[in-house]
């Protein structure tokens, strides 16, 4: 907000009235924040209460009796404790944000991002060594995990985020350092999960994950080697005949090869016999889709723009064409036709469709990932994010593609679903060859029409 205060006439008037001036350490707007916090502190203290504030309250000068909640790393907490202020440690950089993912984001409910396992939470020490050495450790009054709710659309998802990481939080808050033992915590977690079952709590069970990003559609030309891991030691069972796995199904012990089109169903099993949600993975044998014979192309994609906000492609198909056409050099231009500020106030929404060719560099199976509404290759719908919160490309697919030009169609719908504006995405389409570890974006040099 301090950036907004620079343009706010009322804020600037208050700065002048109070004689607040910026210096080398703090801007006038930070001084305004300190003025406000200290003024509020007097109100709070008058009613027998004590102020607690996020570590931003350090900016501009700390209120005399305030307790600081250190969330932007530990630095704010260390600074406050060094000034003899009480501190609650809650740094996101150290795993104290348990609204973050705790498994592969490709197969988990959408989240704000980040990655924090129960092990990471458990291993955090809320009293930094620097404070302990300086005799200031007693100013750390507690530790907290945060669970922000913008992606908690129902109680089940909330519980899925919180448990079992909240159990790890309780132990780092109450257990002496010399008594902490993560392996023992894992053992006791098996028992705790039975108790959670008794209370009907929907806790996270690690799913079988594939290396380099999980995907529920695996194309291959010769054979596919299926490799799975879990981020906590866990039994995995699977079937290859389309039936649902049970605790007595074949136990996964090592990677296995598939040479014909097969449906793999695989799930984790707890010591209690309870199973996690099974994953269904279609493993399809394909021949290389042939490249197109095109006499002449020019760089970029043809793009048509439609004014207005469309929540689905069906709405877009019924829209009146505007005739707004242009050539774009990169897929990024699909999403940046209008400014997309953090507030999204006053944004004039639009949709866009881009068509042309993508040049595949060599024969192979490619995994395809994007946060756009749809990605089509050779007339086939590859990525469909319709109706979803468009973050973290959670509907990847794969295809066997020959070297050369392939038809591509990209669809962007500017709208807000689940609190996330699709305009904030970078419009990229990412490819990963099956023998590569990382996705790379389709570049301008690969696009033509």
Go through each PLM region and give its residues.
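Short, compositionally stereotyped local motifs that mark structural "simplifiers"
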Residues: 180, 186-359, 365, 369-371, ...
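Flexible, acidic glycine-rich loops studded with aromatic residues
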Residues: 50-54, 61-66, 72-224, 231
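Generic beta-strand/beta-sheet core signal
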Residues: 1-2, 52-56, 69-71, 88-90, ...
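Short, charged beta-turn/beta-strand-edge "cap" motif at the junction between a beta-strand
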Residues: 412-416
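Active-site neighborhood of glycoside hydrolase catalytic domains
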Residues: 1-83
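Hydrophobic, well-ordered secondary-structure elements that form the walls
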Residues: 44, 68, 166, 238, ...
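Glycine- and acidic
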Residues: 18-26, 147-152, 175, 246, ...
């Amino acid at each position: 907000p301090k950036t907004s205060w620079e343009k706010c006439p009322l804020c600037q008037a208050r700065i002048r009235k109070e004689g607040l001036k910026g210096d080398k350490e703090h801007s006038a707007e930070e001084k305004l924040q300190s003025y406000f916090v200290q003024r509020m502190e007097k109100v709070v203290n008058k009613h027998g209460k004590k102020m607690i504030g996020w570590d931003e309250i350090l900016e501009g000068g700390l209120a005399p009796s305030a307790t600081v909640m250190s969330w932007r790393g530990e630095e704010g907490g260390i600074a406050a404790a060094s000034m003899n202020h009480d501190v609650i440690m809650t740094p996101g950089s150290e795993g104290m944000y348990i609204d973050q993912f705790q498994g592969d984001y490709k197969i988990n409910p959408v989240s704000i991002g980040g990655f924090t396992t129960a092990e990471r939470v458990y291993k955090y020490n809320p009293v930094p060594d620097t404070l302990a050495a300086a005799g200031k450790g007693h100013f750390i009054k507690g530790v907290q995990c945060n669970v922000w709710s913008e992606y908690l659309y129902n109680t089940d998802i909330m519980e899925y985020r919180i448990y079992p990481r909240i159990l790890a939080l309780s132990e780092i808050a109450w257990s002496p350092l010399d008594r902490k033992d993560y392996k023992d915590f894992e053992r006791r977690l098996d028992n705790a999960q039975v108790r959670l079952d008794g209370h009907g709590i929907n806790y996270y069970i690690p799913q079988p994950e594939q290396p380099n990003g999980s995907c529920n559609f695996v194309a291959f030309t010769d054979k596919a080697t299926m490799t799975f891991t879990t981020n906590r030691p866990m039994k995995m069972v699977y079937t290859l005949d389309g039936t649902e796995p049970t605790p007595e199904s074949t136990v996964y012990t090592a990677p296995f090869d598939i040479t014909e089109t097969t449906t793999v169903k695989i799930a984790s099993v707890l010591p209690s016999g309870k199973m996690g949600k099974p994953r269904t993975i279609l493993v399809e044998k394909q021949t290389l889709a042939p490249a197109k014979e095109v006499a002449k192309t020019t760089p970029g994609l043809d793009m048509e723009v439609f004014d207005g906000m469309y929540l689905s492609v069906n709405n877009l198909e019924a829209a009146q064409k505007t005739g707004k056409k242009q050539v774009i050099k990169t897929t990024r231009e699909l999403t940046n036709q209008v400014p997309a500020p953090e507030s999204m106030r006053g944004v004039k929404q639009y949709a866009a469709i881009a068509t042309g060719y993508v040049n595949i560099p060599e024969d192979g199976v490619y995994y395809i990932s994007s946060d756009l509404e749809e990605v089509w290759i050779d007339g086939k719908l590859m990525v469909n994010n319709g109706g979803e919160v468009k973050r973290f490309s959670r509907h990847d697919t794969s295809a066997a593609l020959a070297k050369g030009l392939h038809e591509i169609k990209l669809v962007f719908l500017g709208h807000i679903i689940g609190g996330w504006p699709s305009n904030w995405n970078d419009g990229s389409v990412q490819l990963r060859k099956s023998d590569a570890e990382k996705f790379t974006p389709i570049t301008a040099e690969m696009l033509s029409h």
